[in-house]
Structure formats: C-alpha cells, structure tokens
Amino acid sequence: MNYKTSLIEIPKALIQKNNIEQIKKLSALKKAKNHILSGELVAFPTETVYGLGADATNGKAVKKIFKAKGRPQDNPLIAHIANLDQFERVVDTKIDNDLEKIINTFWPGPLTVILPKSNLISKITTANLDTVGVRMPSHPVALSLIEITDRPLAAPSANTSGLPSPTRAEHVLDDLKGKIPLILGGGACKVGVESTIIKVEKEKIIILRPGGISREELAKISERKIVRKNNSKNNKPLAPGMKYKHYSPETKVFLYTGKKEKLHRYLKNNENKKLALVFTSETIDELKKRNEFVKNKNIKIIDIGSKTDLKSIANKLFYILRELDKSENEIIIVEKIPERGIGEAVMNRLYKAASEKL
C-alpha cells in the first residue's frame, strides 16, 4: 500500500518545556492516535533515534513495521511505555530491588530491559520469544503519543533496515516516504544512538546491546557483575541489533584504527577516489602538524569532535554518515574512538557498519 506520508512538526517550545499535556492536545497527536488505534504506523522522535511505532498488542499492525523497514521477522522489537502502570501490564514477573533501582534511576531514558512478557504483547512483536524488551523513553512527543493511545508501542528505528538510524525527521522521510502515513517531527535526537539493552540475572547484568546508558553508569547503581553478550549468526537474537548488519550507509565504510602509515599509504594509492575522512579533532590537529593531509580535492575532512566528549560524537555519528551518503563519496573512513562510556555503543555500530579496517 502506498501512503501520502505527512510530516508534522511539533512546536519546539512545547518540547523544550516538556509540556506533555499540551502536546497531547495538538491535532497532530490526535491524528497519530487515530492511526495507531486503527492499526497503522506512526514515526515519532525519542531521545535516542526516531522510532517507527505500532500498537505492540496488535500483531497485524506490528507486521507492517517489518514490511515498511524490510526487517527480518525474527528480529524482536522493543515495547515502549509511558508509565509504570503500563509496565506492569506488559510484563509477567516481579522485579527485584536491584532492577527496581535501575529502572528508577534510568527511566525515562535510553535503557531497555528484557523481561518475561505478558499475554498482552503480541508474539509478532517479540519474534515468538517469551520475553519482551521494555523501555520508557524521555522525549515528550514519544511519551505523549504512548499516553494518548494508552498502548505500548512496538518501535524499532524508523529507517530502512540496515541503514544508519534516523536522528532527524527528514531522515525518516528519506527512507520511508510512501510507506507510512505519518511522521511526527520533534527536532534532532539528543543521544543519537539506540538504547542500551540489558537482561538482569541472579548474579550479573548482561548487556545485549550497548547504547545510551554505559556499563560504567550501570555499575554505579548495581552490585551485580556486568558482562557483554555477543550473538552468533546462528542463534536467535534476544534483542534488536544482535544478529543482522545494521547502521551502515550505502557508501562503503572503512574503520581507521590509528595505523598512520597504513592510512597514508591508502590515501596515496587511492588519490583519484572521492574519500570522506571522519576523524576526531585530536587526529586532525596531529595530521595538520605533520603536514600529512593529502592536498587533494577528492578528500573531504569531517571533524566528528574531541575524544574527551564521546557523547557529542555519539550524537553526530548517524547524522554524519547519512549526510555523507548523499554526497558522491566512494569510501567513508571513520576513526575508531575509545570504547569507554558511550564510546562502546559508538564502536558497536561502527564495527557493524565497516567492511574493512585501516
């Protein structure tokens, strides 16, 4: 089915004031509510990336997400909620004190928790798993939409599956125009990478996907050991982002690991190619001092920010990759950054996006 996709911007003033009650009164939200309750899709902003939402209790509606994105149906979706009453309706378990502390600390925010699901959640949403990832986003437009529909919203990133996640409404329009009826615009996403997904066990917290909440932040709250789980290609994914290739633009991405001689040799041997170098401020300054920049009009230099401000780098990453994908670059070379804090989430995305290392 082809849609005439509408993009409606929510007033910035209401978003900045976090005025959920006024946002819910907007005609755009009422339109979005009608779409959701009639089994249609609505794209909306969160603090991480834009989400493509459907009623998580309606299997037919959720199937439309997989179709619009071209997403494999064994890749589970996260159920987004707006309050703890909804949380109690979507899970079938009692939470312990440690998990309660984690939820109270990081919700609303970029943290998803895997728990046994209730019968309310469609098995299409969970890819036939008996567990569901649950998250309470902090963006006022997301919370307004979830509250006004009184439905948990299944919502992966609102993009074509495999491409960089959308951090602006126009990114959603680029990918999904004609495939969905409505996009709610809410400005640029503050975090810029998806939520952290965790599974809490008796003695440990398993990070299934690094994201907007770092392992260091989790360690400050919980005494449990924190470990990272990587999914093999043959295993059924417990959470989004574990099995399939993600986050990659159509232009080839190479990862620069700091080997200067290898980089210099590559640039020299490929001086006729149109290249984009996405480097940190420190590396750009160092190369300038050594006069190692190749004076070549085919090379575009993008400063992604300082290694001392990894949150800023995370915020820009998907936006930069999408913008460079619109240019005539043959290769995008992105510098590896420290895997601490949110840098772990950034590198998780870059490892998946890159086809080669330098």
Predicted feature residues:
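Active-site-adjacent structural elements in enzyme catalytic cores
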Residues: 1-358
